[in-house]
A protein has these predicted regions:
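Active-site proximal loops enriched in glycine and acidic residues that flank catalytic Cys/His/Asp
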Residues: 12-15, 45, 98, 107, ...
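A phosphate-binding catalytic loop at a beta-strand-loop-alpha-helix junction
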Residues: 90-109
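Long, compositionally biased intrinsically disordered terminal regions
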Residues: 17, 29-33, 56, 60-61, ...
Length: 211
């Protein structure tokens, strides 16, 4: 399999014990079996590392991926021109169990690092500065990302995203944790008492589309 100059890093955020360990182990097995030199698996037990609302430990994940964030770069091109200034050289594929809440938090971190590199390249922010060094820019980024995460979550699970206080404010809060409890209960209710009807409707719609 030839992927040219592209590389992939799979960021696996599932628990490394309990029922999720089996899923993570299967992913490990598949990656090892395929033995592709342009694919790397980076396991990070999100719930273990960030327990007790200590989400500053996400810096560990950032350090694990920082060299590849730089290596993969970003795409940039002149307006009305086919000339490219930069070509992206790789991708991050992030997953948890449903690729929603933990995934959204990790991807927001990756996106912020990439945004920093792009703005630094364009000399909009200085070298060595972080996006959070500019309060208005940081607030806008967090709001856009959190709103997008909430919308994706509503389509998939019927509620806003869990852990949204981190993506929206950059830290975990007790009000955010309480809101997570409400959303988790709402998801449980929908999953057991409402989503069955929706799934049947989708199945019928797909069947009609086939015929």
């Amino acid at each position: 399999m030839n992927m040219g100059h592209f590389k992939f890093v799979i960021v696996n955020l599932v628990n490394q014990k309990g029922r999720e360990k089996r899923v993570g182990g299967e992913l490990d097995r598949v990656v090892l079996r395929t033995n592709l030199d342009f694919v790397r698996l980076n396991a990070f037990d999100f719930h273990k590392e960030c327990r007790t609302l200590d989400w500053g430990r996400l810096d560990m994940l950032k350090k694990q991926l920082r060299s590849e964030i730089t290596e993969f770069g970003f795409f940039s091109s002149f307006i009305n021109s086919t000339e490219h200034m930069h070509k992206q050289k790789g991708f991050f594929r992030t997953n948890c169990m449903d690729c929603l809440d933990r995934t959204n938090v990790a991807q927001s971190m990756l996106a912020k690092e990439s945004l920093k590199d792009q703005l630094s390249y364009m000399k909009i922010i200085g070298n060595g500065f972080e996006v959070d060094s500019y309060p208005e820019l940081s607030a806008t980024f967090k709001r856009i990302w959190a709103d997008n995460g909430d919308e994706c979550s509503r389509q998939y699970a019927g509620t806003g995203a869990l852990k949204a206080d981190y993506t929206r404010f950059g830290k975990r809060t007790f009000s955010g944790a309480w809101n997570d409890c409400i959303n988790a209960f709402t998801r449980y209710f929908r999953n057991n008492f409402a989503d069955g009807y929706r799934q049947v409707t989708l199945n019928i719609s797909r069947l009609c589309a086939i015929f």
